Amino acid sequence: MSYITRTGNLAEAPTLREGENGPYCYARVLVSDRIRQESGDYIDGPTVAYDVAVSGSQAANLVDTAQRCGNTRVTFTGAYRVTEYKGEQTTRLQHEVRADGVAVSLRGQSVTVERRKASDES
């Protein structure tokens, strides 16, 4: 398993769930890299969808932000694995990340920070 940090846009607002260990969500984050051509120009590379598992107060804050703000650019970091699924006609890759950290990116959007009471953290 690898460890990665990526930045991309939420595909949709994730749904907050409650488990034995507290709140969690699965966020789909779409990432496109810029690729430099031989001419020096840049083009958008293929979009890769990452299924990011987020837990605790980070999950609650991510869901709240996505519901209030819509399409949100986020940075995530965590353990990464790729799973290959073979169908009859195609092969599909699933990119999964168990996030240690999730943050709202400041690129192309403004952010307001509200500090929570220590009793609200998990």
Could you describe each region identified by the protein language model?
Residues M1-S122:
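Single-stranded nucleic acid-binding surfaces, predominantly the OB-fold ssDNA-binding core
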